[in-house]
C-alpha cells in the first residue's frame, strides 16, 4: 500500500487546525493525523514520536516505516536523513529498530525454524516455495547451520492470495511436521493435506508488505537490516559479522 498519498490527504484535512498553533499545542493535532493513519495501514498498531536529529522535525516510527513531520504540523517529509559527519543513514537505522520491535511481538511458533547446535546469528527469511533462489538457499540449509546461523522461515508467496504458491504454503504450514513438508516442497515435491483456518500465511504476507518486501528471498538480520536476494553461507556470515 502506498501510504504517502494518504498522508498528504490527511495533512490537508488537518492543516487548517494545526497551522495556527505553536509546537506544544500541535502535538494533539499531529496525534490525530497519525491515529487516523494507523486505522488505514495494515499491521500498524501504534507509533512513536521523537525529536529527530534535524531541528524542527519529529521522527515518526509506524511499524518499520519512518516519516518526518514538522513540529508546526504543516509539512510531511518522506526520505532519507544522512549524517554526513559520521556516514550514517539515520533513517535506515530507525527503520531497523522498528523492524526489530515488530519482530519481538511475533510468536516464533508461527515460523519454521532450523536451529544450529550453537547459535551465533539469527536470520528471518521471507520465502516463496516456488522461488528458485529460495530453493537454492534451502539446499544449503545445513551449511548455514554449520556456521551457527539460525534460520527462521516466514511465508511470502510473491503471487499473492488465491494462487498455487499461496496454497502450497498453506499446506506446508498446516502440516504436522512443517520442516519435513517444507523440505519436500522446496524440492518440488507435492505436499498434500488440509488447509487449517489458523495458518499464518496471510499474517506473514501482510507483515512482509508492511516491511515493503516485494522479492524473495528477503533476509532480515538480527540487527533489523534487510538483505534482498540470495547470499551463499559464507557471504551471509560475513555480512552478519560486519553488522556487529
Task: State where each predicted segment sits.
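Short active-site neighborhood of thiol/selenol oxidoreductases, capturing the structured segment around
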Residues: 114-135, 150-153
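Glycine-rich adenosyl-nucleotide cofactor-binding module
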Residues: 97-123
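Loop/turn elements at helix/coil->beta-strand transitions in domains of secreted/extracellular proteins
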Residues: 119-122, 147-152, 178-181, 216
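Thiol/selenol-based redox catalytic cores and closely related redox-interacting motifs
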Residues: 46-47, 57-61, 65-87, 162-237
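Sec-exported extracytoplasmic/periplasmic mature domains
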Residues: 42, 136, 142, 146-149, ...
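N-terminal targeting signals for export/organelle localization
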Residues: 4-6, 13-101
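Residue-level recognition of beta-strand->loop/alpha-helix junctions
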Residues: 155-157
Amino acid at each position: 500500500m502506498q501510504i504517502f498519498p494518504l498522508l498528504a490527504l490527511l495533512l490537508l484535512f488537518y492543516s487548517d487546525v494545526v497551522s495556527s498553533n505553536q509546537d506544544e499545542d500541535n502535538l494533539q493535532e499531529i496525534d490525530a493525523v497519525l491515529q487516523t493513519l494507523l486505522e488505514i495501514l495494515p499491521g500498524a498498531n501504534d507509533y512513536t514520536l521523537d525529536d529527530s536529529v534535524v531541528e524542527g522535525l519529529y521522527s515518526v516510527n509506524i511499524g518499520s516505516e519512518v516519516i518526518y513531520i514538522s513540529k508546526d504540523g504543516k509539512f510531511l517529509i518522506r526520505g532519507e536523513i544522512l549524517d554526513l559527519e559520521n556516514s550514517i543513514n539515520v533513517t535506515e537505522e530507525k527503520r531497523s529498530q522498528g523492524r526489530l520491535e515488530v519482530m519481538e511481538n511475533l510468536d516464533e511458533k508461527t515460523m519454521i525454524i532450523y536451529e544450529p547446535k550453537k547459535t551465533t546469528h539469527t536470520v528471518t527469511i521471507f520465502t516463496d516455495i516456488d522461488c528458485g533462489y529460495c530453493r537454492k538457499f534451502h539446499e544449503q540449509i545445513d551449511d548455514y547451520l554449520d556456521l551457527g546461523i539460525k534460520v527462521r522461515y516466514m511465508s511470502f508467496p510473491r503471487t499473492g492470495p488465491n494462487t498455487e504458491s499461496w496454497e502450497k504454503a498453506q499446506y506446508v504450514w498446516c502440516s504436522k511436521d512443517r520442516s519435513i513438508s517444507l523440505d519436500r516442497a522446496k524440492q518440488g515435491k507435492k505436499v498434500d493435506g488440509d488447509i487449517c483456518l489458523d495458518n499464518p500465511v496471510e499474517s506473514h504476507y501482510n507483515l512482509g508488505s508492511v516491511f515493503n518486501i516485494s522479492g524473495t528471498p528477503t533476509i532480515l538480520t538480527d540487527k533489523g537490516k534487510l538483505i534482498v536476494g540470495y547470499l551463499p553461507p559464507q557471504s551471509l556470515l560475513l555480512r552478519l559479522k560486519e553488522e556487529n
